[in-house]
């Protein structure tokens, strides 16, 4: 393969890939890919035996009067030489109160078990109560392993001179299990601080008691990145936590419950299950997760918290929460991954205003685009792929807030506004600069602002929600947000408008039911889009309103019992309407004011028929909402201009008379609507070019005057002449025969075709054919004629008459001699010879009660 060929193929492949990527970007987000986590937590098993030691045996004072830290540490040290992957060391702390004056260190394969009623009390001002020993100094997850802490109480017991501390700290290890433990009383730190641990289970524990103002989590999941983030745990290698199960715990009387308030850029916490926990009386956030992915947060109860769940891939103050990787920023964008793959479901949440959250919200998903950042690479740190489903949320502020995210699904939640508490003017569901977000099948009740607010972004869907009593609008779309769909929602008793599209936003609004809004059912004000198949009833002003909106379509909506108009347009609005229905609107069906315009559809299927020399008829399809139609005409001259020639208010056709033959005219039709103050015109139909014809009336023919009766249809070949021109059959005209079988007068109608119109009628006779029973031979010498022949069974008799010589059409000068007996032709002969000179003769017979004559001979 040549270099040129390889280059061409590579370029073509690159172009194809670009097209595919652009195409994929047009599709809706595939929510089926959001599966959450399969986290299993700590996996501690496989021991063949266990050794048990008791701290009292090492001199621990269970009355708490003496320092027991040395005794307890000796018991823990027993695991150094005696514990292994096959032998677990169980260190038992009996019921009692144990004072420790310095921190404790725990080693691999240790089960530290506190019996019911056992409490370890911290009695020093600096540092944690217990940490893993870091015996080998390894990084990653390679230090301690298989540590269990179970039962009892760990009391941080801060004093007035205490420095910030964590009750427990664990890092660079694998498999940590904390269960059925009460951990209480911390000052400006964490109850449990975990960094760089893989395999974590924390269950059935009780976390409470906190002093200080720092917003720190009771359980902190962290990366080991530097001495500021996780001091005393070298090496600093950015190891994150992975595979954590935190379930069935209690968190109360704290600022924050659990999570991560910092992260290393490009490093993610993965596989976290937070389930069945209860959080209550928390002035801050129950769960804060920065840079987490593959999470499930389910079946938790969160009561009286300032914020329930805060999920972020960037923060407002990025330099405070995100730090530089130890490997630096080289190749950092290859390590960034915005797919969160997280599920938040079946949680029961009540949020209230607090010191830290004066404007509370239940759930936040937050991303941020950095441009010209002084601390981190410029990048859109967005969040994708989160489901928020089946939650019960009661809020004194907002329920769900989304910033710079995409692929978020908010479905089947029961969200209500708490009017019984001090509350705040916020939107229930708030979207900012977010795209491909679906808000569906939620029950949204109350709020002082909007039930669903969208600003910026594109491709969002708000569908099949039940929305009641929003303070402002049920759905409010603003800030240039594009390609939004609002469908199938039921909105009642909005404090302002049911649905509002404004500030250059665009939306397709369809199949919604909006009732009893204080103002309009649906309003476009400075926005654009289409409203179709909506039901708008009993609203305080109009059902549909276009206010200074340049491009709006109202199709097939039902506007009933509104206190204003069915449809209203004002200022510079341009509104296309079709198929709308109206009933019992107090002020009327359609009202247009200012420089607004209601634009009807252009008439379709404009056709011409009955085209003739001086007239023609136009027909077209009916235009919905039209009160009538204007018809315009011009000639095809280059400088000709359309002139209105008719206003049709009855039907969809018009006949134009007084036209000039063989002249081309151009027509167009436009629907109009008679609103309250003025006539509104629709769009023009397509131009229809038509040429008038010549009339065939007055034409002549060379048709024969008679033809013989044969019992079959008689037709002729003849020419038709108009103005000296010979017409071409089946091009310029066609013929239609009638009465052209039986004896009598046949009719021929010549009908114009092509450039000819109208018709002309002609006639010819059909007569019985002569029987040739008589032959008349005039003889000039004796002025007599000889009549001879044979009788015929067809004739019943004969007429013989004197004829005017040399004339085809004879005139009878005397009564003819009638011979009734056709079997005796000799009588005819004799009579003729005796009485007549020049004769003519014809046969006759009775046929269906009428005398039918043959041709004269």
Model segments located where?
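Beta-strand-rich modules
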Residues: 656-675, 834, 838-847
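Short glycine/acidic-rich loop motifs that flank beta-strands on beta-rich extracellular proteins
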Residues: 100-103, 122-127, 158-166, 187-194, ...
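Extracellular fibronectin type III
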Residues: 674-692, 847-857
